[in-house]
């Protein structure tokens, strides 16, 4: 059995035509040659196989399915599951998408058709291979079945009658496999027949059309292929790896292959399913949910599998074998690459990722008999190998019965290798000796020849021939002498060895006390006798299963070795082998059963036996050596005698020949003497050898005596071995008896234990019954007593009733309650004893937290998915708009109109890109939501039981030990459900109330609209007002008042507090006063002499004309400026939480059109006289600000009832906050003024802004401070006043100062004269940055997305240029800075907020931020130069602060701080484009970077984490970190003091200023602190050589003078 994980393959289908037309983007990416897929930008999944969009069908099959089909023929089950959302290509991948009218192409065949082809092709190959090998042809049986699971009913797709689903039952057979009863199983014989069955079944499958798929599968389909085969079983392998030959045996294998085509998961919202389709979708999702629960249980944490809910669904029951059972399983997860299906694709990948953790236990489905035969064969092979190892001595059994490798085996291996090594060495030495002997002979021959040649000889013709003959003769004699010497040396060494052996045997014999006699025994006969005894002993040993080797063969093999040294080594090896075999037999007996009593005796016998055997072996070896030595000496003696005789003969022959030749007598004598000397030497050697021979004979006699001793020892050895065998037999018998006794004792103990257990259970059952009986009796007794008491009380009551005294009624009433309380109290006591309330409370807390976590996760995911769906719908709408505009562009011939269409198309494409970015961002958020929630919960959760925290909710409920604990949890769960239901009902009630209120407001708005229509119609102002209202505003009047409520831009909340101090008389005009005024007060004439009187009811009969006018007037009355272009542009990003804008940017509007439409209404230009007169009756916006626009009294009621109502209701509005709605909507209420009702909402906003401005105006002045705050470093000298709201920014040059405020103004000041020079216009929103341009007469003011350049040389301070964040440059006269417009809370499309800006020290470059980048401007040419790239790490972040400086070399350096905590350095040139960061300062801050300051070779950075960091500009390393430099987050940094000795100044949100000494050391030293230097936070600071200026949220600027001046 082998564990194998479920294989998972991911297949991404190609995009469809509809998805491409809808503009869906690909949200998945696959790494090449790597099974990894990435979704959402950074969420990656790794599977066993990943197939991207262009993957063909055959690649999918060959990569992961083909090997499963091959395993089918080895008896292994297999399953292929196709999972995914509807329309993701599951049916196409599996190959069941058949069309009766279309023939399917070969390359389009799916997994199932290809598997069928592969199966029958493999069958043919197996039969052909068997025939080639001469084996029996295997027999195959193939059958198929095809079922579908429709609405949780199993239907047979191959059956003619598919209505009988109740007859199909799911069972589990004896082997644990799932089988279906009642399903038709058809036998197939070829591929075509199987394909026909598959096609017919696929056509019977339930399909239907949905919004996502024209042919959507409405059921789960399972096609099963059964294969049975009978083949020749393979023989087992031997040690060499070859198959053993033997009888042929057959084996039976059976396997099944499930092809599962799961129906796709559906969302009713997207599929549009209703009725039966909806029911089918619900059933499909329920089955897939149960499948997901099974996968989650099998692939749980730490590999622990608890209860697996297979029975929750028929689908999981059918797939029980495939998931966690006996099957090789492959899941093919099909998904869509389109971002419109992003959520479903992500869920599919998560689903498949969990399936990878499942482990199946796979075994071959083999017949029982063939399986048993295979197991026995493998067992026999293993036993044979083990037996061989025991025979060879590789394994032995120690005293404890454990198998160990014999030490003698390792020793034998070592000695064998050593002998081989010595043999090679001896061979090499012999070769070397032969070479040296030859060289020695040559040298001696040459020496003798030279000595002979030096003798004087008589000249003869044959002298040269004689010399050669003499030389050859000398050489022969020398060779013979050398050979004789070597033999002599060998004989001497042998004699020495024999002497040593003799001395050793003498010492041994003396120690044994053996006195050798002169008994004459024949050595050979004694050896033969010893051999016979050994043979008898061997047979005796074999009779008791003691293996051994043939001793005679051992002796014969030892006698054949020629070398004495090697003979001794091999004899020792053979001797050790023999001892090893004998010891092995004894140890095999010892292995079986052991006896401590006999073990000691056996050990002593074994030791003595070993010693005697070794002595016998040594004697035998000495006898053999003596025999060999004797033969050798005899041979050498004969050789020496022959050589002496030959030498004498040769001598005589040489002398005779010399005498015949008549040579020199002296020479002959010399030769004769030399030969005589040689002969003498040889005779001496011969005498020595004869002496040795005599001594050898003595040794032989001694060895015969020792041989007698050997015979005696052998007889003793035989006796000892017999004793050993008897002891072993006795030990075995004792062990058998002990084992039998132990088994009997174990059986008896088990029986006793079982009886004890049964008795204990019986006792426990009886005790329980007795306890129940006692409780029942007690309860019965109590009830009887209670009834008796009730009866007695009833009788007493009856008697009292008869007597007229109603006593005892209370007792009757209270007795049942008392009885119930007693019973409940007893039950509660039992419950308290049954479980621990504290442990249940802990478990309940864990359950509540997990429920809250799951609910929170689901809420977040649903919210993100809804946001993603909204962006997808918006993208679809933009795509439709682009297509429509392109169509009109191709059809139109008007050049101007075509240009407009091109502009609209470009704008729509830009909007499309923005929407696509938002879609990508939402996808990334959805991918990261699980990790973020998990991390959040880990940080916020209290410390609880770790074991409980790791369990799921289901596991916690399943782990209830007692019924009381379950009741406890259910009670709390019931209470929790009631609380949540009550809360939900309350929220629903509030929602309905709000909806009713909205509806009421809509009705009131409609009524007021009708009133306004009637009023304006009576004054004939419709045509005149429509004349100057822009056409696009007229077209935009298509939505209801409720849509206006939703689309209105938020207004500034801070502006509302300025109207709260008005206290005026409240009077609200009623509808009767407006509709049914009398003739005196309801006249609509503003001037009786100038204008004719018009009756309100005079035009009632003019229905058509009045209806048309009403429509036009309705447009005029409900067209807000904030929504004029809300439908043509997309929503821009909102202001960040750290910006100095406090109003929220909502929709997008074009304020130029608004201003153009508002201007005529304010100035009265472009309007007819009648309309101008009607508008002139509105309150003037140019009155004296000291008086206020509502201080002036209107004419009396005689002028008109309208003006009276307007006057009264206007004062009413001042007492409320409805004029400045915090939500910025255009909805009206009953308390809104008539002025607000009779004028457009954008006009009301303008008037409201003027109201706020006039009532908050302060006198602009610079006031000296008496007794100002004084310290060691600086002293407060002056205070600048003049702004109505907080001052956000300040900058100075030599004589001038500029300030920017929340009141949307910037002011230019003369700091020497202490006066205001000029107010620099009204800006769209807060002026959060102001900057002087060095070496020029320009000053910049920054508000929202605009940077305005002002020339302050002229008294008017003209606006020269307007630079937008997008890089657009406008002329200064393109905006009318003198006009007062409403506060702009929206930004146009493609524009972003300028959150940071700075001018370089040369005055040539301007740096402005836009999102995560910084744009660089050339101020000489007024055009953008380039940008600083990636100033923040994330493109969703933005630059929060910016500073520039110049190096001594003239390079310009820019330092940026971002909201994602990082600070970067850029080196900027005049002709640069995209500039990458030069350095990134690490480590980053822990929060948003609020200020950066380069100062004296260092960079100081501050952040919301209230820390200040000091970096070196040389290497970019941090030198110091000042922790908690302030109590609140730091908003500004600047340097103060003389150059080179500046102090670092920091200011924070609570108005505190701190001075730091940063030059004396690497650390920062606090010099002085000015707490509460301002009442509110300090937003900005700047300084000169001796002055410090602080801009605060208390609408003032503080002037501080250095005390060192």
UniProtKB/Swiss-Prot annotation:
- What GO molecular-function term can you cite, just one? microtubule motor activity
> Which keywords fit this entry according to its UniProt record?
ATP-binding, Coiled coil, Cytoplasm, Cytoskeleton, Hydrolase, Microtubule, Motor protein, Nucleotide-binding, Repeat, WD repeat
> Domain of life, per the record?
Eukaryota
Where does this protein have compositionally biased stretches of type Acidic residues? 560-596
Per the record, the coiled-coil ranges are 575-730
Where is the segment annotated Disordered? 548-596, 1085-1152, 1198-1232
**What is the annotated localization of this protein?**
Cytoplasm, Cytoskeleton
Q: Please report the stretch or stretches of sequence annotated as the Kinesin motor domain.
A: 5-358
Residues engaged in binding Mg(2+): 91, 217
* Stored Pfam families: KIF21A, Kinesin, WD40
UniProt: ATP binding residues: 84-91
Task performed by this protein: Microtubule-binding motor protein which has ATPase activity. In complex with alpha and beta tubulins, preferentially binds to the growing microtubule plus-end to stabilize it and detaches following ATP hydrolysis. Negatively regulates axonal length through inhibiting microtubule polymerization at its plus-end.
Extract the PANTHER family matched here: CHROMOSOME-ASSOCIATED KINESIN KIF4A-RELATED, KINESIN-LIKE PROTEIN KIF21B
- Name listed for the protein in its UniProt record: Kinesin-like protein klp-12
Q: Which gene encodes it?
A: klp-12
């Amino acid at each position: 059995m082998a564990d194998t994980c479920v294989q998972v393959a991911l297949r991404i289908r190609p995009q469809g035509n509809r998805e491409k037309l809808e503009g869906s983007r690909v949200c998945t990416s696959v790494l090449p040659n790597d099974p990894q897929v990435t979704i959402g930008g950074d969420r990656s999944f790794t599977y066993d196989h990943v197939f991207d969009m262009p993957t063909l069908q055959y690649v999918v099959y060959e990569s992961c399915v083909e090997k499963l089909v091959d395993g089918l023929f080895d008896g292994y089950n297999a399953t292929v599951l196709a999972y995914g959302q509807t329309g993701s290509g599951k049916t196409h991948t599996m190959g069941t998408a058949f069309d009766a009218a279309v023939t399917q192409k070969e390359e389009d065949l799916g997994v199932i058709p290809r598997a069928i082809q592969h199966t029958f092709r493999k069958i043919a190959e197996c039969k052909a291979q068997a025939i080639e090998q001469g084996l029996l042809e295997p027999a195959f049986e193939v059958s198929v079945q095809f079922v579908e699971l429709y609405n949780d009913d199993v239907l047979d797709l191959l059956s003619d009658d598919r209505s009988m689903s109740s007859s199909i039952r799911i069972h589990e057979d004896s082997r644990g496999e799932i089988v279906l009863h009642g399903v038709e199983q058809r036998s197939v014989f070829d591929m075509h027949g199987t394909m026909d069955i598959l096609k017919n079944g696929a056509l019977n499958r339930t399909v239907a059309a949905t919004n996502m798929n024209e042919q959507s599968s409405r059921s789960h389909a399972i096609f099963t292929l059964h294969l049975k085969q009978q083949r020749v079983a393979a023989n087992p392998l031997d040690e060499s790896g070859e198959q053993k030959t033997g009888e042929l045996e057959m084996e039976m294998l059976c396997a099944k292959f499930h092809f599962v085509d799961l129906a796709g998961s559906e969302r009713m919202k997207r599929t549009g399913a209703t009725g039966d389709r909806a029911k089918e979708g619900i059933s499909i999702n329920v089955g897939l949910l149960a499948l997901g629960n099974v996968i989650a249980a099998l692939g749980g944490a730490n590999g622990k599998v608890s209860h697996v809910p297979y029975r929750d669904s028929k689908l999981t029951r059918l797939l029980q074998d495939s998931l966690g059972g006996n099957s090789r399983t492959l899941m093919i997860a099909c998904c869509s690459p389109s971002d419109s299906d992003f959520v479903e694709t992500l869920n599919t990948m998560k689903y498949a990722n969990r399936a990878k953790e499942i482990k199946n236990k796979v075994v071959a489905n083999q017949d029982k008999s063939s399986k048993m035969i295979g197991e026995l064969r493998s067992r026999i092979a293993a036993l044979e190998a083990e037996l061989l190892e025991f025979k060879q001595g590789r394994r032995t059994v120690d005293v404890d019965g454990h198998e160990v490798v014999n030490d003698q085996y390792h020793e034998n291996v070592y000695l064998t290798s050593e002998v081989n090594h010595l043999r090679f060495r001896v061979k090499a030495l012999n070769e070397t000796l032969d070479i040296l002997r030859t060289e020695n002979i040559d040298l001696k021959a040459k020496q003798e020849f030279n000595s002979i040649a030096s003798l004087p000889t008589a000249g003869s013709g044959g002298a040269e021939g004689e010399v050669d003959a003499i030389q050859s003769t000398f050489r022969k004699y020398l060779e013979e002498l050398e050979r004789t010497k070597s033999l002599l040396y060998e004989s001497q060494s042998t004699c020495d060895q024999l002497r040593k052996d003799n001395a050793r045997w003498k010492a041994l014999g003396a120690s044994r006390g053996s006195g050798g006699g002169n008994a004459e025994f024949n050595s050979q006969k004694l050896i033969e006798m010893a051999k016979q005894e050994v043979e008898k002993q061997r047979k005796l040993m074999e009779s008791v299963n003691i293996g051994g080797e043939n001793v005679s063969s051992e002796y014969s093999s030892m006698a054949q070795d020629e070398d004495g040294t090697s003979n001794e080594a091999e004899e020792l090896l053979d001797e050790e082998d023999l001892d090893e075999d004998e010891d092995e037999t004894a140890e095999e007996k010892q292995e079986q059963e052991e006896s401590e009593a006999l073990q000691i005796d056996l050990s002593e016998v074994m030791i003595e036996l070993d010693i005697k055997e070794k002595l016998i072996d040594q004697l035998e070896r000495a006898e053999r050596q003596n025999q060999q030595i004797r033969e050798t000496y005899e041979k050498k003696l004969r050789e020496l005698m022959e050589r002496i005789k030959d030498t004498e003969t040769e001598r005589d022959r040489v002398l005779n020949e010399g005498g015949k030749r008549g040579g020199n007598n002296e020479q002959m004598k010399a030769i004769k003497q030399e030969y005589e000397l040689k002969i003498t030497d040889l005779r001496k050697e011969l005498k020595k050898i004869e002496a040795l021979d005599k001594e050898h004979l003595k040794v032989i006699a001694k060895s015969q005596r020792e041989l007698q001793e050997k015979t005696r020892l052998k007889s003793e050895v035989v006796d000892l071995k017999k004793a050993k065998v008897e002891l072993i037999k006795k030990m075995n018998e004792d062990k058998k008896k002990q084992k039998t006794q132990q088994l009997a004792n174990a059986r008896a103990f088990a029986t006793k234990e079982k009886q004890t257990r049964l008795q204990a259970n019986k006792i426990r059952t009886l005790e329980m019954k007795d306890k129940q009986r006692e409780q029942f009796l007690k309860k019965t007794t109590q009830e009887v007593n209670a009834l008796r008491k009730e009866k007695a009380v009833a009788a007493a009551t009856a008697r009292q009733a008869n007597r007229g005294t109603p006593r005892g009624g209370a007792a009757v009433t209270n007795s049942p309650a008392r009885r119930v309380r007693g019973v409940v109290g007893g039950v509660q006591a039992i419950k308290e004893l049954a479980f621990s309330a504290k442990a249940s409370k802990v478990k309940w807390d864990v359950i509540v937290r997990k429920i809250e976590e799951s609910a929170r996760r689901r809420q977040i995911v649903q919210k993100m998915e809804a946001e993603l769906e909204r962006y997808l719908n918006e993208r679809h709408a933009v795509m439709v708009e682009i297509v429509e505009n392109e169509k009109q562009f191709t059809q139109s011939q008007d050049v101007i109109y075509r240009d407009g269409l091109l502009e609209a198309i470009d704008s729509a494409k830009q909007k499309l890109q923005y929407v696509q970015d938002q879609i990508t961002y939402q996808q990334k958020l959805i991918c990261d939501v699980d990790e973020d929630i998990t991390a959040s919960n880990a940080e916020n959760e209290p410390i609880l039981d770790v074991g409980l925290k790791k369990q799921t909710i289901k596991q916690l409920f399943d782990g209830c030990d007692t019924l009381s604990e379950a009741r406890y949890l259910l009670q709390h769960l019931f209470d929790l459900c009631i609380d949540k239901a009550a809360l939900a009902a309350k929220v629903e009630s509030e929602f309905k109330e709000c909806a009713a209120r909205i509806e009421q407001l809509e009705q009131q708005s409609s009524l007021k609209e009708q009133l306004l229509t009637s009023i304006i119609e009576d004054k004939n102002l419709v045509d005149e007002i429509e004349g100057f209202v822009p056409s696009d505003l007229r077209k935009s009047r298509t939505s209801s008042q409720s849509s206006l409520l939703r689309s209105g831009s938020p207004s500034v909340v801070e502006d509302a507090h300025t109207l709260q101090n008005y206290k005026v008389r409240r009077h609200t005009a009623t509808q009767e006063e407006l509709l049914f005024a009398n003739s005196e007060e309801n006249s609509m004439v503003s001037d009786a002499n100038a204008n004719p009187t018009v009756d309100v009811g005079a035009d009632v009969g003019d229905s058509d004309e009045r209806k048309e006018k009403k429509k036009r007037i309705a447009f005029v009355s409900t067209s807000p400026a904030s929504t004029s272009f809300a439908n043509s542009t997309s929503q821009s990003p909102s202001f960040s939480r750290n910006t100095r804008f406090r109003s929220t940017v909502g929709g997008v509007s074009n304020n130029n059109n608004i201003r153009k439409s508002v201007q005529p209404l304010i100035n009265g230009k472009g309007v007819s006289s009648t309309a101008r007169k009607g508008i002139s009756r509105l309150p003037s916006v140019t009155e004296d600000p000291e008086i206020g626009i509502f201080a002036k009294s209107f004419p009396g009621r005689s002028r008109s009832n309208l003006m009276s109502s307007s006057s009264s209701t206007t004062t009413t509005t001042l007492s409320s906050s409805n004029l400045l709605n915090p939500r910025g909507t255009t909805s009206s209420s009953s308390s809104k003024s008539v002025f607000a009702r009779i004028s457009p909402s954008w006009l009301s906003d303008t008037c409201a802004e003027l109201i706020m401005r006039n009532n908050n105006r302060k006198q602009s002045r610079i006031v000296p401070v008496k007794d100002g705050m004084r310290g060691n470093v600086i002293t407060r000298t002056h205070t600048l006043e003049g702004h109505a709201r907080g001052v956000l920014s300040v900058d100075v040059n030599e004589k001038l100062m500029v300030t920017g405020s929340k009141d949307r103004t910037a002011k230019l000041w003369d700091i020497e004269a202490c006066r205001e020079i000029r107010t620099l216009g009204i800006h769209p929103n807060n002026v959060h940055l102001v900057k002087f341009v060095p070496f020029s007469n320009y000053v910049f003011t920054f508000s929202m997305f605009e940077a305005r350049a002002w020339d302050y040389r002229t008294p008017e301070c003209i606006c020269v240029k307007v630079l937008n964040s997008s890089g657009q440059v406008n002329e200064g006269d393109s905006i009318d800075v003198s006009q007062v417009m409403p506060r702009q809370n929206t930004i146009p499309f493609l524009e972003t907020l300028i959150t940071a800006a700075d001018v370089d020290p040369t005055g040539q470059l301007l740096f402005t931020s836009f999102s995560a980048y910084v744009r660089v401007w050339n101020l000489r040419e007024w055009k953008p130069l380039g940008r600083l790239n990636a100033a923040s790490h994330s493109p969703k972040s933005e630059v929060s602060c910016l500073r520039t400086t110049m190096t001594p070399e003239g390079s310009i350096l820019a330092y940026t701080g971002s909201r994602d905590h990082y600070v970067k350095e850029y080196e900027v040139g005049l002709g640069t484009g995209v500039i990458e960061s030069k350095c990134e300062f690490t480590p980053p801050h822990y929060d948003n970077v609020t200020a950066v300051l380069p100062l004296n070779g260092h960079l100081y950075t501050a952040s919301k984490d209230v820390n200040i960091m000091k970096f070196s500009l040389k290497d970019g390393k941090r030198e110091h970190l000042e922790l908690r430099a302030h109590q609140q987050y730091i908003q500004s940094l600047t340097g103060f003091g003389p150059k080179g000795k500046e102090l670092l100044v920091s200011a924070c949100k609570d108005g505190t200023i701190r001075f730091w000494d940063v030059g004396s050391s690497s650390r920062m030293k606090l010099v002085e602190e000015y707490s509460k230097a301002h009442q509110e936070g300090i937003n900005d600071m700047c300084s000169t050589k001796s002055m410090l200026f602080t801009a605060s949220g208390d609408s003032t600027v503080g002037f501080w003078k250095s005390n060192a001046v």
